[in-house]
Amino acid sequence: SDNTTAATIVMPTGTGKTETILSIVVAGHFKRTLVIVPSDALREQTKNKFVQLGLLRELGLITDITLNPIVATIKHGVDEHEHLDELLKSNVIVASASALAKFKSEYFVKLTEACTHLVVDEAHHITAATWVRVKSQFKDKSVFQFTATPFRSDGSRVEGKIIFNYPLKKAQDEGYFKPIEFHPVREFVEEQSDHAIAEKAIELLRADLAAGLDHIVMARASTIKRAKDIFKLYANEEDLKPVLINSKVKKKADVLQAIRNREH
């Protein structure tokens, strides 16, 4: 009822934020929605959910006559009217914050003017500067921001009125999270710690695979150089087909799909 204040929905990661976004867009009959996500990976994941309406159709929450929306993604800035016109034929436009930052002001204004609603997923990952630019273009429209925490990655608070808060404790009580198996790794020589962690990870993975579990191991690093160093610790396990992926890898989409297909 208040278009001057963003509606904030607080939900822990893994409790169905994306399906909730689908639900409000469908139930609200939103004409054209701009969905902002923090990363390229989440952009593709969100797009794929919207294309088939995710679990809404699978669970029978919408009727068979409900059409799937026309969905577009923004992967980089737009600098031609034709490209923008093509985007605006869609019901849902999914963009990463970094892609929107590359828009020329003229096209950014036209894009936001054409969108009737704004949804921000993982709002705590959007910097305050980006948020101010986007929010200023939606000051008289409905804005929904989903977040797992009231603080942004730059330390500033996520603004807006909280209209729904799903506490982590309640999510735990209702079975959204599985118990965590803790496997300690003790290595007192710092230079050997990565090697010790890799050994334990490989040991656990082999045990899980032998038990018939469809598991994989992911080692995440803070920089590309660090990732390359850590990858060397796994590279000799050739039967497990380890693979290195980062923002500079060629044909990254193909590598990701190969991982999903369990080729690695």
Locate each region found by the language model.
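Pre-Walker A (Motif I) flank of P-loop NTPase domains
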Residues: 2-7, 30-31, 213-216, 264
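Conserved interdomain linker/interface between the two RecA-like ATPase lobes of SF2 helicase motors
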Residues: 162-235
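Conserved helicase ATPase core of P-loop NTP-dependent helicases/translocases
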Residues: 240-264
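Post-DEXD/H (motif II) to motif III coupling segment of the RecA-like Helicase ATP-binding lobe
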Residues: 117, 124-180
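Conserved RecA-like ASCE ATPase "motif II neighborhood" in helicase/translocase motors
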Residues: 78-119, 125-133
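Conserved helix-turn-beta segment of the N-terminal RecA-like "Helicase ATP-binding" lobe
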Residues: 41-77, 235-240
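Walker A/P-loop
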Residues: 2-24
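Conserved Walker A/P-loop ATP-binding site and its immediately adjacent core
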Residues: 20-23, 27-61, 130, 222-227
